Amino acid sequence: VAALYAPTGGIVCPFGLTIALAENAADNGVEFKFLTEVNEIKKDGEGYILETGKGAITTKYIINAAGVYADRFHNMVSGNKIHITPRKGDYCLLDKEAGGHVSHTIFQLPGKLGKGVLVSPTVHGNLLTGPTAVDLEDKEGNATTAEELAFVIEKSSIGVKNVPFRQVITSFSGLRAHEDGDDFIIGEAEDAPGFFDAAGIESPGLTSAPAIGVYLAELVAGRAGAVQKKDWKRERRGIVRPEKMSVEERAELIRQRPEYGTIICRCEGVSEGEIIDSIRRTLGAVSLDGVKRRVRQGMGRCQAGFCTPRTMEILSRELG
């Protein structure tokens, strides 16, 4: 038996990282257009016209980072066609009581469909197992199946014994964007000047995302003659976490802002103050899932069975 030990390996919260980067981008002037579907992209002189459900957008440069839909947009402007297959992966998430079962991510030998089923702690103290690797054609096909979850349970036991699967609190699946050429496609399309791809980004896409972002920014800046902002805001205001404070710090916070003393999510210890902050901050939450991704309301053992009505009341009150 042999293994490769990688002490520099680490884990992050993927949606927490994504939201933090988006908030920082917005604070630096990036405009987000949510619920705006791109229906068609047409070349227009030296630029492009994006036809959306909310009108046309004219631009000289496009960065195509549309995940499993990146092939659709690339093929609208380029004769060098690509095809992306959605590769579904099912996961099991275990309660925090199981979080100490392993102290670092345990991978198996990779295969042609990916790195195999892993067992890993999360940054919040849970235990995560998965994923499977099933190729689909449905770009929205993210339903879990009993067969695939059984596969996760079976294969997890190869690398880690006695995983306490009786403590599973939820299961979910996601789609990786697998390009038929088995590689990332990063850069300017040869026959579509100003159209830049970040397509076919699957594992280790999260790890490489910061470097991909810098690389594409440099490419676009070089074409556009752009220079780095002098007043760039490097720091993003974090979300106040009373559970990480000392008793004295928490008491002072609650004295000044009583909403931090009202616990809404008992499983994760999330206060009303944290939920309000998640809604009011830059690119704030507008849904239960939005709150969940920012402050973990509903992510605990009862999976939002207790806190959903209270959170909906706060969302309604804050958003009108």
Give the residues covered by each predicted segment:
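C-terminal catalytic lobe of FAD-dependent flavoproteins
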Residues: 14, 20, 110, 114, ...
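Short cysteine clusters
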Residues: 265-267, 302, 307
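C-terminal target-recognition/interaction regions appended to catalytic cores
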Residues: 294-297
